[in-house]
């Protein structure tokens, strides 16, 4: 199998990289500005990502086959208003665009929040898609749910895949089941006391439950204060309160549990404070979803390579 070189932009703690390394890809560059994510990335991959992508020239980035980026969704205030290239300047997508233009990798994978497709009445996504097309890429996109790829977390994200050649590509199909929470959650008796809610909070949560409660379950409190108990987790969130997700109505998720809900292996080391683990886990990607997409992308690239090789062989026989 051909070894493809990747770069990991807005890398977080390396979830996208993990998904592609499962297929033998070699990462040659990474960028992440958050110091805690950098620290966790370094302890697990043996290299510290470069800092702010705005301080890095595309010419300084190594040649690569696949660009990977879980880029932040910033408001495209003038997106879709016919202002040409300036309509993406000042947003972090501009950096991706500049690197694709300069380095022309064979393929890319971008990940973002589901609402990217509807932001500014769809203009934001239209600008992104048009820019990628103008760079010569055939672009595919789809919203996928982590719950459909083996993890007990309802997390819908848009995945944008592009190829420099007009390659056939299909997004992976859902596997139709997810792991039981009992395989993700730790036993309460090994969880430190400071993770448990006060009696008052527990009573308040319990009084808000109106339906039968499955066990084990993760209790989710929405913005209106309504509480639901589910056999899976709602999406891990950077902005959620410490009690946004509660295990069986009695305690907060631990750091390892949050990483498991994103599909990271137990060997993935945590070396940052709990408050920062919540942030990097909420900002991260679901590794099994990335792994499934990576497999489909690698398959498309390999098929194209085989066709080129076969064409060369046939031409030599003529």
UniProtKB/Swiss-Prot annotation:
<keyword id="KW-0680">Restriction system</keyword>
<keyword id="KW-0489">Methyltransferase</keyword>
<dbReference type="InterPro" id="IPR018117">
    <property type="entry name" value="C5_DNA_meth_AS"/>
</dbReference>
<feature type="domain" description="SAM-dependent MTase C5-type">
    <location>
        <begin position="4"/>
        <end position="304"/>
    </location>
</feature>
<dbReference type="InterPro" id="IPR001525">
    <property type="entry name" value="C5_MeTfrase"/>
</dbReference>
<comment type="similarity">
    <text>Belongs to the class I-like SAM-binding methyltransferase superfamily. C5-methyltransferase family.</text>
</comment>
<dbReference type="GO" id="GO:0009307">
    <property type="term" value="P:DNA restriction-modification system"/>
</dbReference>
<keyword id="KW-0949">S-adenosyl-L-methionine</keyword>
<feature type="active site">
    <location>
        <position position="73"/>
    </location>
</feature>
<dbReference type="InterPro" id="IPR050750">
    <property type="entry name" value="C5-MTase"/>
</dbReference>
<protein>
    <recommendedName>
        <fullName>Type II methyltransferase M.HaeII</fullName>
        <ecNumber>2.1.1.37</ecNumber>
    </recommendedName>
</protein>
<dbReference type="Pfam" id="PF00145">
    <property type="entry name" value="DNA_methylase"/>
</dbReference>
<keyword id="KW-0808">Transferase</keyword>
<dbReference type="InterPro" id="IPR031303">
    <property type="entry name" value="C5_meth_CS"/>
</dbReference>
<keyword id="KW-0238">DNA-binding</keyword>
<comment type="function">
    <text>A methylase, recognizes the double-stranded sequence 5'-RGCGCY-3', methylates C-? on both strands, and protects the DNA from cleavage by the HaeII endonuclease.</text>
</comment>
<dbReference type="InterPro" id="IPR029063">
    <property type="entry name" value="SAM-dependent_MTases_sf"/>
</dbReference>
<dbReference type="GO" id="GO:0003677">
    <property type="term" value="F:DNA binding"/>
</dbReference>
<dbReference type="GO" id="GO:0032259">
    <property type="term" value="P:methylation"/>
</dbReference>
<dbReference type="GO" id="GO:0003886">
    <property type="term" value="F:DNA (cytosine-5-)-methyltransferase activity"/>
</dbReference>
């Amino acid at each position: 199998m051909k070894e493809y070189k990747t770069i990991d932009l807005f890398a977080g703690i390396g979830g996208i990289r993990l998904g592609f390394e499962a297929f033998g890809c070699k990462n040659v560059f990474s960028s992440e500005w958050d110091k805690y994510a950098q620290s966790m990335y370094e302890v697990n991959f043996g290299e510290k990502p470069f800092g702010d992508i705005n301080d890095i020239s595309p010419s300084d980035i190594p040649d690569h086959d696949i660009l990977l980026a879980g880029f932040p969704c910033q408001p495209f205030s003038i997106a879709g208003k016919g202002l040409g290239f300036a309509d993406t300047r000042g947003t972090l997508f501009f950096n991706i665009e500049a690197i694709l233009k300069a380095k022309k990798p064979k393929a890319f994978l971008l990940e973002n929040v589901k609402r990217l497709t509807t932001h500014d009445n769809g203009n934001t996504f239209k600008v992104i898609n048009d820019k990628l097309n103008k760079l010569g890429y055939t672009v595919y996109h789809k919203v996928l749910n982590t719950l459909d790829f083996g993890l007990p977390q309802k997390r819908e994200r848009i995945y944008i895949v592009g190829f420099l050649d007009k390659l056939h590509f299909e997004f992976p199909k859902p596997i139709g089941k997810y792991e039981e929470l009992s395989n993700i959650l730790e036993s309460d008796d090994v969880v430190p006391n400071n993770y448990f809610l006060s009696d008052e909070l527990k009573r308040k949560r319990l009084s808000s439950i109106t339906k039968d409660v499955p066990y084990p379950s993760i209790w989710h409190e929405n913005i209106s204060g309504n509480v639901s108990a589910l056999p899976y987790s709602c999406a891990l969130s950077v902005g959620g309160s410490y009690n946004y997700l509660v295990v069986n109505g009695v305690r907060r998720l631990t750091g390892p549990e949050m990483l498991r809900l994103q599909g990271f292996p137990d060997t993935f080391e945590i070396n940052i404070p709990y408050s920062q683990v919540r942030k990097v886990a909420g900002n991260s990607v679901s590794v099994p979803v990335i792994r499934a997409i990576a497999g489909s992308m690698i398959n498309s690239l390999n098929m194209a390579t085989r066709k080129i090789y076969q064409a060369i062989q046939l031409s030599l026989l003529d």
